[in-house]
Amino acid sequence: MARVNDDIDNRDASDAEFFSAPPFNPAEALVQLRRALRAVTGLTERAHRFEWKGRQAVTLTIDGERLQARLARRPAASPEWESRSLKNGAEVRKFGDDVRQRVSRWNNADE
């Protein structure tokens, strides 16, 4: 019986290595997130930030192994920022979804 359990334990370890996610690359994530945000209706890219109707809405910077992102609570000349430190692909996708939802809300309120 011990031999069967050893085989199962070894297989589980090799499966974990096979299915492990690649390490997070903030530079690559920045490129993908910028591409996704360019597709959001109402956002305009300027240098390392995105604007909504000429007002700052999103800023993105790389900080070591993380992507630092700031999202304006409301668009303004000097907005109140919501800061996030993105350290994996899931957090980057969630941030992109949050930006889309917030910009959609701003667009609807502006109409």
Predicted regions span which residues?
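Charge-dense, helix-prone N-terminal extensions
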Residues: 1-111
